[in-house]
């Protein structure tokens, strides 16, 4: 169990999770997924220990896929307060292929989440939240990109986390706008290197790129993830790595959603004012749990929750 600390943000913290709600199609089977759900389903049991809540911000079609995702939100006790619905577009689908060595190749079809709209309820919750997470995928379409930028630029959240996800390559100008408004950034080794290439960084290694961009954009800290190798935190005090973490692997386990779980662990540790070491440990614990399970959003059992609470 991590060291006990008081919630430094205040009572009943509210966190927003923005982006692509999709149906993950894996080996011909459909299951609820998308980074906002994966992240929120992992964070919600932890926030509830503080009386807090996580709201998913996305857009669904009026179809079977939308029903599957609505049921998943309900199962994870995630309120649909900021969930948008449309009859003009179908719910997004992510075609996932798991390679022999465990890598996952994704193909994201156009979907309703490409049209997430800025609206008054979202503006109100952006002003009220203490934490915000969004990935880079919504930057692929003008509508969802515009809403995401508005969310980052108007939110009063003290933790505005940007999660790199380069299944498509955003324009440098868009990435720069998000980084200017973000406080924390997370990505894999490969994603940091790609980000450095897009932004023409002088550095060419992941940790050095994260350090360069942390300084350039006045970020509080950055997290570099490396699968089973664990996470490295980079901030003004330098680099902090953790110890290896593992859980018994389900026979049908796959790594889809593990990075989103790591982001949830990091967010919770930040909300609680945990030490640098505990931030890395929280990310490693939830990331390892997600990787040990056969679902994108498997939920967090009490035994795992209590390791962080």
What is each residue range found by the language model?
Residues 1-16, 203-309:
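Conserved phosphate-binding/catalytic region of the ribokinase-like
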Residues 12, 23-25, 48-136, 306-309:
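Conserved N-terminal subdomain of the carbohydrate kinase-like
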Residues 13-20, 161:
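Short, hydrophobic/glycine-enriched beta-strand segments
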Residues 20-21, 137, 164, 261:
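Active-site metal-binding loops of divalent metal-dependent hydrolases
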Residues 30-46:
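Short catalytic helix/loop segments, enriched in acidic residues and glycine
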Residues 53-54, 80, 158-160, 222:
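Hydrophobic anchor at the start of a short beta-strand
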Residues 124-125, 177-178, 215:
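Structural alpha-helical scaffold elements that stabilize or flank donor/cofactor-binding regions
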Residues 131, 135-208, 229-230:
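Conserved beta-alpha-beta core of the PfkB/ribokinase-like small-molecule kinase fold
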């Amino acid at each position: 169990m991590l060291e006990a600390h008081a919630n430094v943000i205040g009572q009943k913290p509210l966190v927003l999770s923005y982006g692509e709600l999709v149906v993950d199609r894996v080996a011909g089977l459909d299951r609820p997924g998308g980074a906002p759900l994966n992240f929120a389903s992992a964070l919600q049991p932890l926030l509830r220990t503080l009386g807090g809540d996580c709201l998913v911000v996305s857009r669904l079609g009026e179809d079977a896929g939308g029903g599957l995702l609505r049921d998943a939100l309900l199962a994870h006790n995630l309120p649909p307060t900021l969930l948008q619905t449309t009859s003009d577009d179908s719910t997004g689908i992510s075609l996932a292929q798991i390679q022999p060595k465990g890598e996952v190749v994704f193909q994201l079809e156009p979907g309703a989440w490409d049209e997430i709209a800025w609206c008054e309820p979202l503006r109100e919750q952006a002003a009220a939240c203490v934490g915000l997470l969004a990935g880079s995928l919504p930057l692929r379409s003008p509508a969802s990109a515009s809403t995401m930028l508005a969310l980052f630029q108007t939110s009063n959240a003290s933790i505005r986390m940007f999660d790199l996800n380069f299944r498509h390559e955003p324009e440098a100008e868009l990435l720069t706008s998000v980084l200017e408004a973000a406080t924390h950034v997370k990505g894999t080794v490969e994603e940091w290197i790609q980000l450095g290439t897009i932004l023409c960084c002088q550095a060419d290694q992941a940790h050095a790129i994260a350090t360069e961009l942390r300084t350039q954009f006045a970020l509080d800290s950055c997290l570099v993830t490396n699968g089973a190798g664990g996470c490295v935190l980079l901030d003004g005090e330098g680099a902090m790595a953790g110890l290896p973490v593992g859980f018994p692997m389900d026979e049908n386990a796959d790594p889809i959603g593990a990075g989103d779980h790591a982001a949830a662990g990091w967010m919770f540790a930040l909300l609680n004012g945990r030490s640098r070491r505990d931030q890395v440990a929280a990310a490693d614990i939830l990331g390892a749990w997600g990787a040990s399970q056969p679902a994108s959003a498997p939920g967090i059992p009490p035994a795992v929750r209590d390791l962080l609470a």
